[in-house]
Amino acid sequence: MSLLPFDFVSLDIVYYPVSWIMWVWYKLFAAVLGPSNFFAWALSVMFLVFTLRALLYKPFVRQIRTTRQMQELQPRIRALQRKYGKDRQRMALEMQKLQREHGFNPILGCLPMLAQIPVFLGLYHALRSFNRTTGGFGQPHMSVTENRMTGNYVFTPVDVGHFLDANLWGAPIGAYMTQRSGLDAFIDFSRPAVILVGIPMMVLAGVATYFNSRASIARQSAEAAENPQTALMNKIALYVFPFGVVVGGPFLPLAIILYWFSNNIWTFGQQHYVFSMIEKEDEAKKQKAIERRTANAPAPGSKPKYVSTTAPVSVNGFSKDTMISDDGAKLGSQEADSIDWVTETKTATTPADKPDCVGYNNNPTSHTRRSGQRTKRRKR
């Protein structure tokens, strides 16, 4: 009995992590359902998908935000295309400037989709490696006994035997409908059973792909949907992808079809949750903005307050806000506004301007008050 050695110059850096996550879930479900149970292996594949998608949650949220930003900026992008359509270099510079202004990177929006590619390849290779009696590209051609005595990455030879023995009504989880070779590796194989189990799984995977694409398209803005390129991609996602799943299903192991179905179910639910969360955040931001405007708005019936940028007008050292009436009361702003204010000007001191006695001034134009005299109002 042996396990596969780790090869640092191969894709083992992908195969081993994927196999390890699947192995953990398999051990948990096998403890309840049994090691050779079809649903124990099926659930391990499904929860492998859920685990990887949960790890990619934050990049997925960033992808949704980037997509929404791109839709909001479509009018400006089309304006740039009309203006610099013939100058590709200038167009690229203006697009980079627009992206920097709004702080987003379109490449980040593709990260979740790109990250799933090596995961899919890793799972596909790990599932194929359970049955090495078929040979083929990158696979040794082993006998049935040698195959059951060889481990599969983190799976022991005993686990390999349990995988090959797991079936539903004679349909092994690692078999596919058009399989012609490697049938002896399974303890029980029935092609009608594989077709009977595989067709509903294909249809469900295709339907899940369709509704997932439909939900994504429904959340696009009207301006984005009017773009010819976007409209073409929407049609491909809405019709070609689901059709491709159904057509390609007979050539894929049942576990891969289950992987595709689980991935689309998770994406549909996660997409609905993330869009609802982002819409609530946007609504909360709008509500806070309205509350700030309401708090800063003047009370009903009140006059707006003006802040003067000039020095306060004063008469003989008394400002408008500190004027005292004849009866000793402090004047309000409205009463002070009714006073004819005369600004004090400085003139050259001449003998005629000098007072002839203490507290009096001979200059009739001077407004210097006598000592102890109160300022009086002039009625308009």
UniProtKB/Swiss-Prot annotation:
The keyword Glycosyltransferase does not apply. GO terms for cellular component: plasma membrane. Its main location: membrane. It is found in: Cell membrane. Keywords: Cell membrane, Chaperone, Membrane, Protein transport, Transmembrane, Transmembrane helix, Transport. One of its GO terms (molecular function) is membrane insertase activity. The chain crosses the membrane at residues 4-24, 29-49, 107-127, 192-212, 238-258. It is a multi-pass membrane protein. Residues 287-308, 326-380 are annotated as: Disordered. Residues 367-380 have a biased composition (Basic residues). One of its GO terms (biological process) is protein transport. Interacts with the Sec translocase complex via SecD. Specifically interacts with transmembrane segments of nascent integral membrane proteins during membrane integration. Required for the insertion and/or proper folding and/or complex formation of integral membrane proteins into the membrane. Involved in integration of membrane proteins that insert both dependently and independently of the Sec translocase complex, as well as at least some lipoproteins. Aids folding of multispanning membrane proteins. Belongs to the OXA1/ALB3/YidC family. Type 1 subfamily. This is Membrane protein insertase YidC.
